[in-house]
């Protein structure tokens, strides 16, 4: 009996210790990881979409600023690679995991986006198929009196800077959203694609913010064809890839569109098309699609197909 009593006390103490340790630990630390892509260009991972940090003669341009609360850790990591001031943010599109950190940067920093993204960021509508976390801000920019919103926009193409510091911005059409910007660091031959090329997977098609399942394949193919002298591509959430990977991804999305349209023409329902879909063998290695996203994408292509 005495042995059982002692054991019970020890177990209780252990549970209290575990609970106390868990309470003391608090939320996980926000750690930004850094990869040097080329001499003055870095990719910074975790906390949302991949950020690019481009060190220029007169300061730093940052592409995408991650989730709420990740702006400060991103700023600290940038300080570890350069002491130059941040002069510009370029947001590839409107989603919160790419733009929310804007509000944690100095108010003097210029924010640049495609003109459609600027409109989308005024409203910050939840993307198609995504349920916001209970503690997520409804509109982080309204909560911060408009701080972090774009001051400069472009329509089809814009160049910023010259020579080694030149950045070219392109818009090739609807895809992930209706404002996906392609950011080219011209002298380095590197492009940041944002989430229109998030990785080798089924994309998130955000019809709420103007995305298109019918057009995304053509948009990707146009980017692969029209942007010259690029050999590396920073993806939205995956590893650095190549133009050949981008061409393959364009074909993957076109194949998906064709599959859905053929199913609709044959009289199949959205549920039937989604249930039957498998990643084609020629795209072996692509991530298996989550069921909800697959059905959302089938629905979007279905609705766009008349």
What are the residue ranges of the model-derived segments?
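Bacterial N-terminal signal peptides that target proteins for export
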Residues: 1-10
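Accessory terminal helices/loops
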Residues: 10-25, 225-230, 239-306
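Conserved beta-strand hairpin/beta-sheet module of binuclear metal-dependent hydrolase folds
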Residues: 32-77, 181-185, 189-195
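Extracytoplasmic/secreted envelope proteins and their assembly/folding machinery
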Residues: 38, 51, 71-75, 102, ...
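Short, hydrophobic/aromatic-rich segments at coil-to-beta transitions
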Residues: 38-42, 164-169
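Divalent metal-coordination and catalytic microenvironments
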Residues: 40, 54, 64, 78, ...
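Metallo-beta-lactamase
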Residues: 59-61, 67-69, 159, 166-255, ...
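Active-site HxH/HxHxD metal-binding segment of metal-dependent hydrolases
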Residues: 79-159, 178
């Amino acid at each position: 009996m005495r042995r059982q009593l002692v054991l019970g006390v020890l177990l209780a103490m252990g549970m209290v210790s575990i609970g106390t340790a868990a309470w003391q630990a608090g939320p996980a630390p926000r750690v930004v990881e850094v990869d040097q892509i080329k001499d003055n260009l870095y990719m910074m991972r975790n906390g949302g979409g991949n950020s690019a940090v481009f060190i220029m003669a007169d300061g730093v341009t940052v592409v995408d600023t991650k989730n709420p609360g990740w702006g400060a850790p991103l700023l600290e990591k940038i300080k570890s690679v350069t002491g130059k001031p941040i002069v510009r943010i370029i947001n590839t599109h409107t989603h919160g995991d790419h733009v929310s950190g804007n509000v944690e940067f100095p108010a003097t920093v210029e924010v640049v986006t495609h003109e459609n993204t600027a409109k989308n960021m005024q409203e910050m509508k939840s993307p198609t198929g995504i349920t916001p976390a209970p503690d997520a801000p409804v509109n982080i920019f309204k909560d911060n009196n408009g701080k972090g919103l774009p001051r400069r926009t472009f329509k089809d193409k814009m160049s910023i800077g010259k020579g080694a510091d030149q950045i070219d911005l392109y818009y090739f059409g609807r895809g992930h959203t209706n404002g996906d910007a392609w950011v080219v660091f011209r002298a380095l031959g590197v492009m940041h694609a944002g989430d229109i090329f998030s990785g080798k997977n089924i994309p998130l098609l955000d019809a709420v913010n103007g995305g298109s399942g019918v057009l995304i394949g053509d948009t990707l193919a146009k980017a692969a064809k029209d942007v010259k002298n690029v050999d590396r591509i920073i993806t939205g959430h995956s590893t650095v890839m190549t133009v050949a990977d981008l061409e393959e991804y364009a074909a993957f999305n076109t194949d998906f569109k064709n599959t859905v349209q053929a199913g609709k023409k044959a009289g199949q329902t959205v549920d039937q098309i989604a249930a039957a879909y498998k990643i084609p063998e020629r795209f072996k290695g692509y991530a298996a699609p989550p069921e909800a996203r697959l059905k959302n994408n089938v629905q979007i292509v279905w609705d766009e197909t008349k």
